[in-house]
Amino acid sequence: MTVGISVEKGKQDTPPLELHYLGDKVLRQKAKRIAKVDDEIRTLAKEMLQTMYSSQGIGLAAPQVGVNKRLIVIDTDPENPANAPLVLINPEIKKFGQQLCPFEEGCLSIPGVHLDVIRPDEIEVSYRDEQGKPKRIKASGLLSRVIQHEIDHLDGVMFVDRVENEIALSSQLKQRGFALKSVQRIA
């Protein structure tokens, strides 16, 4: 699960990419598969990691920086220099575990909003790494949740679409200046 992309884990004064926020239509588009993993994709992944670290996040999907590609970056332990980030290109969940669990989620595209979302605790995911090699991992706990959250972004879904507590959702969105009409409930 190591990445061949070297990135300093720290906040930059000016992150290389600009985040997009709830209400921006780019976040609701289904991202396109990446046909070829090349230096352009590796550069994008590196800049996404730099932007994620600068924003104090643990995951970021390409649509969140206005890029309509199926690419996500994750680091569930950004304070630990020894923990290598993950780059997942064209990730696809192959299997969901049966145990569902609620957990509070937040999102760099909806700053300040933190609400419980119910998701499977375990998943199995296939993807290509930053060299274009096919990979498959089993993930549980926080890593599983972050992968699911970021893959949702690739499908135009945001975590607030999955929140069941409508009162808390409405309240937090309003407090942070986001419109409830931007939420697209998942049935």
From Swiss-Prot:
GO process terms (BP): co-translational protein modification; translation
GO molecular function ontology, one term from the record: metal ion binding
Cofactor note: Binds 1 Fe(2+) ion.
UniProtKB keywords: Hydrolase, Iron, Metal-binding, Protein biosynthesis
Assigned EC number: 3.5.1.88
Known catalytic reactions: N-terminal N-formyl-L-methionyl-[peptide] + H2O = N-terminal L-methionyl-[peptide] + formate
Disulfide bonds: none
Name of the top EC class for this enzyme: hydrolase
Needed cofactors: Fe(2+)
Superkingdom assignment: Bacteria
Active site: 150
Amino acids binding Fe cation: 107, 149, 153
Pfam family, one: Pep_deformylase
Family: Belongs to the polypeptide deformylase family.
The protein's role, per its UniProt record: Removes the formyl group from the N-terminal Met of newly synthesized proteins. Requires at least a dipeptide for an efficient rate of reaction. N-terminal L-methionine is a prerequisite for activity but the enzyme has broad specificity at other positions.
Name used for this protein in its record: Peptide deformylase
Lineage: Bacteria, Bacillati, Cyanobacteriota, Cyanophyceae, Oscillatoriophycideae
